[in-house]
Amino acid sequence: MPQAHKVTFSKKPKSFVTRRGRITSNQRNALDSLWNQYIVSEVSDIKEFISGKYTLLDIGFGAGETLISLAESRKDSTVLGAEVYLSGIGSVLSKADNLKLKNIRIVNEDAEDLLQQKIPDHSIDVVLMFYPDPWPKRKHHKRRLIKKEFIKLLNSKLKTGGIFYFKTDWKDYFNEVSCLFKEDSDWKELSLKDLGEHLRNMPSTSFEKKAMKAKRLLNTKIVEKVN
């Protein structure tokens, strides 16, 4: 079985801020009763879950609309979600249990740490990152997750032909990400029509609906790993 690729990062600020969000009673009940069933943290458990399967990784899945949709539409796949906020995890656990989904696992930790330390090389087919924090203030741009180092890390974890699917409502962030991929010959740009039905027909997330209501422009970047 392939081993996790070691990429060395300089110490830098996290791309998220830990906060105590409100957790509903339903979310709390799901966290208490379903944690051991769906949450994985050990490298061996993650490797066993994704080994030899079509695997999608949803980074920062929020309320889990895309995560649940993918698990339902591709029951032959494994869907791994990375999320640091317990409210979103609680929502997903409740939905997954109600729908009797067996092909979902959740990792409650920083996505960069997960990729660097626990995901085997060349093991992921699709990575999704929808509406990550854009850190709009210039002094906070260093906190943005997608940097040149992160793209190299993504490359090492995706299979050849694997896809990175990114959405943001912040034009400056989109332009920055677009330039990074354009400068890297290991990636080829795709359009929505190039994707499978399970990726074309995902529901709008709650954040996406809010952005549309506020008339913020939605920007999409889809790239395929070619080298």
Predicted features, each with a name:
Residues C179, D184-N227:
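Class I S-adenosyl-L-methionine
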Residues M1-T55, E65-E72, L93-D121:
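S-adenosyl-L-methionine
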Residues Y85:
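Conserved SAM/SAH-binding beta-strand->alpha-helix loop
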Residues G60-G64:
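Class I SAM-dependent methyltransferase "Motif I" SAM/SAH-binding loop
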Residues I59, A82:
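Conserved beta-strand/loop positions that form the S-adenosyl-L-methionine
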Residues G161-T168:
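Conserved beta-strand signature within the Rossmann-like core of class I S-adenosyl-L-methionine
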Residues I146-T160:
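A short glycine-rich, Lys/Arg-flanked "PGG" loop and its adjoining helix->strand segment in the class I
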